[in-house]
Amino acid sequence: MKVKPSVKKICDKCRVIRRHGRVMVICDNPRHKQRQG
């Protein structure tokens, strides 16, 4: 899980979602998981 000030899609399978007021990227590739913070 990378924590970044701005989250972006890295590949076509990345999806930007909101969980508990946080913006996150979830993907099939676990290296692409990001959270805004």
From Swiss-Prot:
Example GO biological process: translation
Keyword terms of this UniProt record: Ribonucleoprotein, Ribosomal protein
SUPFAM superfamilies referenced in this protein's UniProt entry, alphabetically: Ribosomal protein L36
Signal peptide limits: none
Pfam families, per the entry: Ribosomal_L36
GO molecular function, one term: structural constituent of ribosome
Cysteines engaged in disulfide bonds, as pairs: none
Gene Ontology CC, one term: ribonucleoprotein complex
InterPro entries named among the record's database cross-references: Ribosomal_bL36, Ribosomal_bL36_sp
Family annotation (NCBIfam families): rpmJ_bact
Family: Belongs to the bacterial ribosomal protein bL36 family.
Name under which the protein is recorded: Large ribosomal subunit protein bL36A
Organism encoding this protein: Streptomyces coelicolor (strain ATCC BAA-471 / A3(2) / M145)
Lineage: Bacteria, Bacillati, Actinomycetota, Actinomycetes, Kitasatosporales
